């Protein structure tokens, strides 16, 4: 979950649904849904980070869902997604495509967090 510095926009990852939701939180007592961004089949958005200028939302797509015996039922698509953020919209940036299933050449990596310099 991430919120803008002014507190007017809230972003929530819906892990098992494969979606990121954007709310208008200008009135925190009555948040309004702005956008539901569907990341597609087998996605599992987990960690969200806003760039410093708050124009992009970086989404790590790895959410591990295990049962009591350790069997994995869902773990996301191992990608990093970037969405363009505006006042009233959240749009996937199709120019950005970092797929950790193939990026390292020896199998899937599991992106978990994000750090900006």
Specify the residue positions occupied by each region the protein language model found.
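Short loop/turn segments immediately following beta-strands, especially the blade-tip
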Residues: 22-31, 82-93
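Surface loop/turn motifs at the tips and blade-to-blade linkers of beta-strand repeat domains
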Residues: 36-41, 95-99, 105
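Short coil/turn segments that connect the beta-strands within blades of beta-propeller domains
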Residues: 6-8, 53-55
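Conserved beta-strand position repeated once per blade in WD40 beta-propeller domains
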Residues: 47, 111-113
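Short, conserved, GDST-rich strand-edge loop motifs in beta-rich repeat architectures
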Residues: 60-80
């Amino acid at each position: 979950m991430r919120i803008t510095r002014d507190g007017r926009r809230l972003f929530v990852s819906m892990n098992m649904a494969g979606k990121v939701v954007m709310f208008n939180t200008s009135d925190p007592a009555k948040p309004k849904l702005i956008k539901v961004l569907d990341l597609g089949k087998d996605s599992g958005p987990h960690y969200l980070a806003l760039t410093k200028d708050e124009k992009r939302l970086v989404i790590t797509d790895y959410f591990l869902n295990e049962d009591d015996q350790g069997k994995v039922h869902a773990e996301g698509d191992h990608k990093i997604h970037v969405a363009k953020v505006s006042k009233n919209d959240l749009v996937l940036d199709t120019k950005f495509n970092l797929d950790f299933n193939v990026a390292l050449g020896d199998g899937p990596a599991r992106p978990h967090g994000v750090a900006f310099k």
